[in-house]
Amino acid sequence: MEAVTFGVLGPVTAERAGDALALKGPRHRAVLARLILARRRVVPLDRLVRDLWEEPPPRAVGAVRTFVGDLRRALEPDRPPRAPARLLVTEGPGYALRAAPDDVDAWRFEAAVAEADRLPAAQAPDRLRAALAQWRGPAYAEFAGEEWTRGERSRLTELRLRAVERRAEILVDLGRAAEAVPDLDAHLTEHPWREEAWRVLALALYRAGRQADGLAVLRR
């Protein structure tokens, strides 16, 4: 059976062979997202309860166990009764998602960005473009208001913004400045406070033969 792949760079998803798996309700997806965020580490049951509810109901522990059972059936539908789970496992005081590094889009994205830094400059733009293409929307989109996603959402978003700017900078250095301009324009329309992006845009315009536009950017 093919591996299950997970997405958190946008709405939380799980797929097998390109087919979406039914994850039931928002709290099921919240449990899955919280385990993905933990990066294969165990999340104690009481921590899951605190993260899912501001004021946990009396049967919150049982509810989390039900959510986990439902998720296991969705992720491993062919697992024999009473056989231990291989993907969403019970360990010590809680649960962990033992997904492979390539099976979570956020993990693949980070690995690709790191790889681009090691590649020859001529190969780096394509690698960064492929990495950025994995984003389908804001990270952990449906849980943007949750305290437990805040730090990771901020970190991933900053990594994405830097990847856009780094790709443009490399294109300029390679003499492909005109290719960098449209992406930087779109980037700065959405994130106008990015000073480094303005600097790279001014340089890209200048190198592309649009000196007046480049100077206008610097004078903004």
How would you describe each model-predicted region?
Residues L48, L71, A131:
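Residue-level signal for inorganic ion chemistry
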Residues V68, R72-R79:
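C-terminal flanking helix
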Residues M1-A3:
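Intrinsically disordered or compositionally simple regulatory linkers and C-terminal tails
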Residues V42-R50:
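Short acidic, hydrophobic short linear motifs in intrinsically disordered regions
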Residues V8-R29:
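A structural micro-motif at secondary-structure boundaries
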Residues L21-A22, P26, R34-R40, W53-V61, ...:
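Intrinsically disordered, charged and Pro/Gly-enriched terminal/linker segments
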Residues T13, R34, V42, D70:
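Short, surface-exposed polybasic/aromatic micro-patch for ligand or macromolecular engagement
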Residues R59-D70:
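Short amphipathic alpha-helical interaction segments
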